Amino acid sequence: LQNKRVAVIGIGVSNQPLIELLLSREISVTACDKKSREALGSLAEKLESQGCRLHLGERYLQGLDQDVIFRTPGMRPDLPELTAAVARGSQLTSEMEVFFEVCPCKKIAVTGSDGKTTTTTIIAQLLKAAGKTVHLGGNIGHPLLAETGGMRPEDIAVLELSSFQLMTMAHSPHIAVVTNLAPNHLDVHRDFAEYISAKENIFTHQTREDIAIFNADNSITAE
């Protein structure tokens, strides 16, 4: 990302560490958010003092032309403003996609309609009890991208991944776990088929050396 202009959409909890990481590496960052400067309060001043540009308000997605655009997890990648930016040459990505690219250790990821957080937490606790150094994150805990510099190859990253995070993923974890599938988030996904397709991305890019675990008691995952 060096020498590239970067836009980060959303200045929420999940993206603030990403913004600060990019700024710490002297990358040109524009943070975009629907909130007003008044709503952001002191956070707006803090980011600007670190060299971050702000693009705020109802038109926060207008005119995106940065080299790389990080979308917030719950945002569809095919919004007209984003597809227009991609057509102009921007690369659309997310914090989790970049994490998969740079994380030096093996990754275990959990998705599903129910039980994701419980399953992810149990896996992390079992590995810790076995003496492993575990990094817990994704849709649970806190963003892990800023911690990759301190991760070792022998560590394990345990991740909870939502359908929104998985929609555009081009990488899969070493171990993928799907708890179950049932109609969910259809206010964002076009239909149940798209929701299932997003979930399938957790194992789509696995190799013969990787492991996929499914719930045989769920009619959809059993197929």
Task: Tell what function each PLM region has.
Residues 61-66, 73-223:
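Phosphate-binding loop of NTP-binding sites
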Residues 1-94, 98:
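N-terminal leader/targeting and accessory segments in enzymes
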